[in-house]
UniProtKB/Swiss-Prot annotation:
Belongs to the CowN family. The gene is cowN. It comes from the Bacteria. Is required to sustain N(2)-dependent growth in the presence of low levels of carbon monoxide (CO). Probably acts by protecting the N(2) fixation ability of the nitrogenase complex, which is inactivated in the presence of CO. GO terms for biological process: nitrogen fixation. Pfam families: CowN. This is N(2)-fixation sustaining protein CowN. Keywords: Nitrogen fixation. InterPro entries: CowN (IPR024899).
Amino acid sequence: MGKYDRYISFKNANWESQSSGVMDGLKPHIEAADSPFWVYFMRQRELAHQRGLDDLRVLHNFLPTLRELLEELDDQPTLALLEQLEESCM
């Protein structure tokens, strides 16, 4: 992977794959539906996709809440993916 500067371009940032990885990590929590937040999150994701927005935008919009929930759930792998995505692409 080439070097990039996130403030200039997402070229070589692999943001689509990183976003997909975070969404894959969230999937078990969404399916468990232990929090009403997940229903709201998925509805907002659906609306964002209808407006042509991608998962990077959705994840960015909910970053603090997702971080807090992942910490509470002690999901360190998904939290690490989210933090990597934030650092490299947000």
